């Protein structure tokens, strides 16, 4: 598994506060049964959310659509 860093995510969402909110909302979606957009590979929802952000699969649009 490739190591995901905050810097990788900040390349996609430059504002670190927005990036944190996006990761939190997406991790909550995953923890209540949301489908991951990447291969889970036994990762926790927070890591999966960060991987999705770093690959550009999840963005700030999630902030307006709500948590679930």
UniProtKB/Swiss-Prot annotation:
GO terms for biological process: DNA-templated transcription. Promotes RNA polymerase assembly. Latches the N- and C-terminal regions of the beta' subunit thereby facilitating its interaction with the beta and alpha subunits. This is DNA-directed RNA polymerase subunit omega. Belongs to the RNA polymerase subunit omega family. HAMAP family: RNApol_bact_RpoZ. Its EC number is 2.7.7.6. GO terms for molecular function: DNA binding; DNA-directed RNA polymerase activity. It is an enzyme of class 2 (transferase). The RNAP catalytic core consists of 2 alpha, 1 beta, 1 beta' and 1 omega subunit. When a sigma factor is associated with the core the holoenzyme is formed, which can initiate transcription. One of its GO terms (cellular component) is DNA-directed RNA polymerase complex. InterPro entries: DNA-dir_RNA_pol_omega, Pol_omega/Rpo6/RPB6, RPB6/omega-like_sf. It comes from the Bacteria. It catalyses: RNA(n) + a ribonucleoside 5'-triphosphate = RNA(n+1) + diphosphate. Keywords: DNA-directed RNA polymerase, Nucleotidyltransferase, Transcription, Transferase.
């Amino acid at each position: 598994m490739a190591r995901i860093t905050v810097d990788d995510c900040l390349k996609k969402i430059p504002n670190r506060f927005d990036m944190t909110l996006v990761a939190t909302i997406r991790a909550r979606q995953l923890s209540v049964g949301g489908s991951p957009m990447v291969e889970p590979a036994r990762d926790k929802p927070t890591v999966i959310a960060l991987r999705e952000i770093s690959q550009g699969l999840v963005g700030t649009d999630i902030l307006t659509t709500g948590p679930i």
